Amino acid sequence: MPWANRCLTSLRQSIVPCDITIIDNGSTDGTQDYIHNNFPEVDLIRNKENLGFGQANNIGLQKALDNNYEFVYLLNQDAWILEDTFKHLIDASEAHPEYGVLSPIQMKADGLHFEEKFGSYIIPHHQVFSPSLTEDLYFQRIEDVYEVSFVMAAHWLITSKCLAIVGGFSPTFSHYGEDNNYLNRTNYWNYKIGIVPSARAIHDRGDSKWSIEKEMYVNDYVGSLVSFSNPLRRESLDTKIIQLLKRGIRNRQMVLIKYALRLKKERCLADANYERTLKEKAFLK
C-alpha cells in the first residue's frame, strides 16, 4: 500500500486520459479499501488469492481485448509515470508499428538515476545492451525508439495488435521469468521490443537486495524454464536438469538439487504450455 497513492495519482495527472484497472492479488493490508475510498474511478478486481504476476495481469489483458482498447499499459504497484509518459510512448508506437512492446526510461525514485536493473541493461557487455542508445544518450542525439531484447515489465506499453497475437502470460511462470518468456514470444511473432528515451517513468524498488538463494532461483530454476520455453531457440530441459544436479552435488548445494528435481516434476506442464505459445492469443480467450 505505500506506493498506491503515488502510482494512482500519477495516472490521474497523465495528459493522455486512461482507464485504470487494478488486479488485487488477495491483499489483506487495507489496500482494497484505500483504493475504493480514494480512487473511485478505478475498476478494482479483487482476487481471493495471490495468482502471481502473470496470471493476475492476464485478467486485465483479457479485459483490454474484450473492450477493444488500442493500448495496454502494465504498471507495477511500486512504480509511477510522469504527465507525458503515455504521450511519448504512444507517439513512438504510432510512428513505429513494428514494435509490440515499448518501455520508457525507468528511473529511481529520485528521478535522477537509472533504476538499478534497468541501468544494467543499457551498459556495455550486457546481453540486451543497445550500443546506439548508450552512445546517443551521451552525445544527445536521440532516436524515437531503440530495439532491445529485454526490458522489465514494471512499465510496458503493449499494442492491441501485438496482444491479440502474442496473448497473455504463460502459467509456467509463477514468479519471475514471465516477462522474459513474453518478450521471447513477442519476437517469435515478429514484433520488436523497444525503449523510448523521450519517455521517463519511475520504478521505486527501494533498497531491496537479493539473497544468494534468490539469485540461484532466478538464474538457475527460472532461467532453465525460460530457455526451455523459448520458441526462438529452445534448449533441452534435460540438459539443464543434469547440469544443476552436477553443480549441486559438486558444490554441496542442496538448493540446486531441489531445483533440478522440481524442474523434472514440472516438465510436462511446461511442455504443454510451450505448445500453447505457438498459437495466437495464447492463455487468453
Role assignments for model-derived ranges:
Residues T9-C18:
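Short, acidic, metal-binding catalytic loop of nucleotide-sugar glycosyltransferases
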Residues D24-D33, E49, A79:
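A conserved acidic beta->alpha catalytic loop
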Residues N47-N67:
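Glycine-rich, basic loop-to-helix element that forms the pyrophosphate-binding segment
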Residues Y69-W80:
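Short beta-strand-to-loop acidic/aromatic patch adjacent to the donor-nucleotide binding site
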Residues D84-K117:
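Conserved donor NDP-sugar-binding/catalytic core segment of glycosyltransferases
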Residues I122-V148:
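Short, flexible, basic/aromatic active-site loop/helix in glycosyltransferases
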Residues S149-I158, C162-G167, T172-R200:
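A short, conserved alpha-helix in the catalytic core of glycosyltransferases
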Residues K214-K285:
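Non-catalytic, C-terminal membrane-associated alpha-helical segments of glycosyltransferases
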